[in-house]
Amino acid sequence: MSEGTIRIGIGGWNFPPWRGVFYPDKHPQAKELEYASRAMTAIEINATFYGRQKPKSWQNWEQVAPPGFQFAIKGSRYCVSRSKLAESADSIANFFGQGFEVLGPKLGPILWQFAKFKRFDRDDIAAFIDLLPGTLGGITLRHAIEPRHKSFDDPAFFELCRARNIAVVLDDSDEYPAIEADTADFAYARLQRMSEDVLTGYDDAALDGFAARACEWRKRGDSYIFMINGAKVRAPAAALALRDRLGV
């Protein structure tokens, strides 16, 4: 069995504090995605959590990003910010109707970030998972669920995810539990404890640890590792430092 691909990236690309730090001075804002998609191998799009994006935007992003690059897409808040996830069928259909299948092979996983108050309810979560499409426009979809309540650290939840090849997102966070489970043929991690006092966001020991973990994930399939929160200004440097350690 061949090893999987490790993709490392950041959340979004339009972040003013990155200008002059990650992006060169006076770099055109219109070309920030072009720059970021060549420095990283994946980007997590957060704007889709708040609303649909225009078909023209998806087409443009597909054209700008290089071959081999992938976008992870955050599922709409209207799908996940509710007490009964089983009732989100219409919102899920609306989310998948915005046209991002035009990304083709540049379409990465769909991230479903549950509300921090959402507790594990087997019937509700099973019904929600049943609503998630397996394909879109001929593309096989990958789904990743980010549970942010400790009640999801439950074999019953892992079993539901494993049955649909859904990854359980690993959070490195001061606020949310780190729930790790082998439930899919890919891994998804969101690293959220970067410090502004450390130029690379995380210190050497932490980055070495993440690199070792990524090497283990690679043995079973692809992995997606995003530097997301904490001192976001350090996210690109953290991602590049991890890429350098892994040679990817």
Residue ranges and their predicted role:
Residues M1-V248:
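Residues lining hydrophobic/aromatic ligand-binding pockets adjacent to catalytic sites
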